[in-house]
């Protein structure tokens, strides 16, 4: 039994001209994609009014992107939201659809190698579920990357990554496609960004608060300068309600 399809949220500001980047459909061919078209409207504008005015245009774009994702093999669900607050909307959809990850959409003409940046043990199962779910059948090279923390020896890092590797192999990724790499750095984000340059896509967790700011807190131009490819941000498990 292969891994189930991981659910990935793809938020696009459709009316700002944001489209599905080149290669996204191939990257997410084995996913269940929640394609979120959103448009941020001024406080004083009612969402119903915005929907009446722009809904049709936005929906036709969204459907075009959904068709491209489906043609590559993904299961797709579309949502169109007019909102006063983008972050809250994205968060709500992650929760409603139980999304394993959110895609920061950048183009990836082809994905041959993925950097999986792992900090701590929290939520590791979610990372491996995503990586195996997306890439088990794709022949992609996977690099598991860990920046050692305070008081952690290189051996600790290696044994941590060894466990992650075994989990991936169990989930269907060929062991000869997995490399492990442990580095020491005072600036983990810089280290990740530097490593990312030699890969086509990055998978990282949101458990490290600086990661979320790295992805959503900086203007996307800055991320694009640091890393030009797509970033999959694995969400932490939500407390059961």
Residue ranges of model-derived segments:
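Small/aliphatic-rich secondary-structure junction motif
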Residues: 1-48, 113-159, 165-178, 187, ...
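A conditional alpha-helix N-cap/helix-loop micro-motif detector
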Residues: 17, 58, 83, 124, ...
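Short, aromatic/basic amphipathic alpha-helical patches
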Residues: 25, 50-57, 61-68, 156-170, ...
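Short glycine/serine/threonine/alanine-rich loop segments
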Residues: 33, 74, 99, 140, ...
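Structured cytosolic domains appended to multi-pass membrane proteins
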Residues: 37-123
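Short beta->alpha junction loops
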Residues: 77-84, 178-186
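Gly/Ser-rich helix-loop-strand patches that form or flank binding pockets
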Residues: 83-134, 196-241
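A short, acidic, amphipathic alpha-helical segment used as a generic capping/interface helix at domain edges
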Residues: 165-166, 184-196
């Amino acid at each position: 039994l292969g891994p189930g399809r991981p659910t990935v949220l793809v938020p696009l500001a459709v009316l700002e001209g944001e489209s599905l980047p080149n290669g996204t459909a191939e990257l997410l061919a084995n996913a269940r994609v929640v394609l979120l078209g959103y448009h941020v409207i001024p406080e004083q504008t009612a969402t119903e009014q915005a929907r009446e005015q722009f809904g049709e245009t936005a929906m036709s774009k969204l459907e075009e992107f959904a068709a491209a994702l489906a043609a590559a093999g993904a299961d797709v669900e579309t949502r169109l939201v007019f909102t006063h607050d983008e972050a809250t909307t994205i968060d709500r959809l992650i929760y409603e659809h139980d999304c394993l990850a959110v895609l920061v959409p950048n183009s990836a003409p082809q994905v041959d190698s993925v950097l999986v940046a792992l900090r701590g043990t929290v939520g590791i199962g979610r990372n491996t579920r995503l990586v195996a779910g997306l890439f088990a059948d794709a022949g992609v090279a996977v690099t598991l990357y860990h920046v050692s923390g305070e008081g952690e020896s290189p051996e600790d890092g290696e044994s941590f990554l060894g466990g992650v590797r075994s989990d991936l192999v169990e989930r269907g990724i060929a062991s000869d496609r997995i490399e492990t790499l442990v580095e020491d750095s005072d600036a983990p984000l810089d280290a990740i960004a530097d490593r990312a340059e030699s890969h086509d896509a990055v998978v990282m967790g949101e458990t490290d608060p600086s990661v979320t700011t790295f992805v959503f807190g900086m203007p996307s131009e800055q991320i694009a300068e640091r890393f030009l490819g797509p970033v999959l941000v694995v969400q932490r498990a939500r407390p059961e309600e």
